[in-house]
Structures are given as C-alpha cells and as structure tokens.
Amino acid sequence: MRFVCDVMLGKLARYLRMLGLDAPYISNPAQLKSYANKSSDTVFLTRRSLKDTKHGNKILIKSELIDEQLEEIKEVIKPLIKSDKMMSRCIECNTPLVGVDKYEIERFVPEYVFHRYNAFSVCTACKKVYWKGSHTEHMMEWIEKFMTDH
C-alpha cells in the first residue's frame, strides 16, 4: 500500500515513512492526479478535494496538526505497520534504507558518531546516513505510544 501525500502534508509523509510505510510526497498538482490514477493500491492523502481522480482511495485530512492527522488515518495505517519495517525508509525522500559497513560512511558522519555506533544505514537516493542514536530512541518511543493509544 502506498500513501501519496500532497503539498499540504509533508510532515505527515515523514511520519508515515518513520512508521515504515511507503509515503511519497508530491507537490505538483498535475503529478498528484496522475499518480493517484495509476494504481488501485494507492491511498491519496490530501487537504484538498480531488474530484477528478478515478482510481485509488482518497482520504481528506481535515486537521493541520500532525497528531490529529495521524489519528484521522490510524485505522487505515495501523494494520500495515510492521515492527521490522519501522525506520526502514529515508524520512527525507522515501527511499528504502540499505545497511552499510561503518567504514564506508566514516567521512559522512561526525567523528563521535562513528566511534560510538556500529550499525549504519544509508539512503541510496539522497545519501543521508542513519544510525540508531537518541533520535531513533525518541522516534521509537513515539511509535510505541502511537500504536498503543486508542
């Protein structure tokens, strides 16, 4: 399942990626409409009306607040969230992350990070490097709270 987020939902796209979901963020309205029409397993998330899309599911997001936006789609996304997929996509560009040897990324991370951590992942598209530091712990705490709140 793919969740295509429109220009008004960039932050929501990042949170969906954190949860391991495929969430492209597309800002061009013409591109959005053709994207939504391509596949029936696409859910189009928007803060605007989409009268002329013919295929795919559409969800109109009413809130401007990220916590409320996630609540609006929680019933749809919760069954799709898998623990082994969390934190597996680039939060910036949605590309699946690839594990790399720490010595391959030594020059791309601060020295203290290189010496403190052993497991690293990289986005092959935008080259952003990820590691399981305190930021990941905070994200995982948020995910756990999100998954258990009713």
Task: Kindly give the residue locations of the regions a language model identified.
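Short linker/helix segments within small regulatory modules
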Residues: 107-120
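Structured, non-catalytic alpha/beta "coupling" segments that mediate domain-domain communication
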Residues: 74-75, 92, 96
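Short, intrinsically disordered terminal segments enriched in charged and Pro/Gly residues
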Residues: 38, 143-150
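Long, charged N-terminal interaction/targeting segments
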Residues: 1-85
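Short cysteine/histidine-rich zinc-coordinating motifs and their immediately flanking basic loops
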Residues: 101-108, 134-142
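Short cysteine-rich clusters marking metal-coordination/redox-active sites
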Residues: 90-93, 123-126
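Short functional micro-motifs and their immediate structural scaffolds
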Residues: 95-99, 131
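Short metal-coordination and nucleic-acid-contact micro-motifs, chiefly zinc-binding Cys/His arrays
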Residues: 83-87, 116-119
